[in-house]
Swiss-Prot record:
CDD domains: Frataxin. This is Iron-sulfur cluster assembly protein CyaY. Keywords: Iron, Metal-binding. Disulfide bonds: none annotated. NCBIfam families: FeS_CyaY. InterPro entries: CyaY, Frataxin/CyaY, Frataxin/CyaY_sf, Frataxin_CS. Pfam families: Frataxin_Cyay (PF01491). Belongs to the frataxin family. GO terms for biological process: iron-sulfur cluster assembly. SMART domains: Frataxin_Cyay. SUPFAM superfamilies: Frataxin/Nqo15-like. It comes from Burkholderia lata (strain ATCC 17760 / DSM 23089 / LMG 22485 / NCIMB 9086 / R18194 / 383).
Length: 109
């Protein structure tokens, strides 16, 4: 994958996360979202955080959550965990739901 293709796909991931948090905040959620360059920080009401950031040199997207740190690479049309193969948005849904204490669903762009 070229650098340009990576950045296009990875930025779409960040945009999808931002849209989902904005939509969730219109409902029952109160999630603080901060973007600093290619780093998104989601802060939940209980003070816990999830950080999603891009790693251009490795062409990966990373998640840091209470559950641990996870690296995702674009494989066969999806962002997949480099160790387990878990899809990025299903994993983020699980981690965010656990930390928020309310269901929240993230979907691929």
């Amino acid at each position: 994958m070229s650098d340009t293709e990576y950045l296009t796909r990875a930025e779409a991931v960040l945009a999808a996360v931002e849209r989902t948090v904005d939509d969730a905040n219109d409902g029952d959620h109160d999630i603080d979202l901060e973007r600093n360059g290619s780093v998104l920080t989601l802060t939940f009401e209980n003070g816990s955080k999830i950080i999603v950031n891009l790693q251009p040199p490795m062409k990966e997207v990373w998640i840091a959550a209470k559950a641990g740190g996870f690296h995702y690479r674009f494989i066969d049309g999806e962002w997949r965990d480099t160790r387990t193969g878990t899809e990025f948005f299903s994993a983020l849904t699980e981690y965010a739901t656990q930390q928020a204490g309310l269901p929240i669903t993230f979907n691929a762009p």
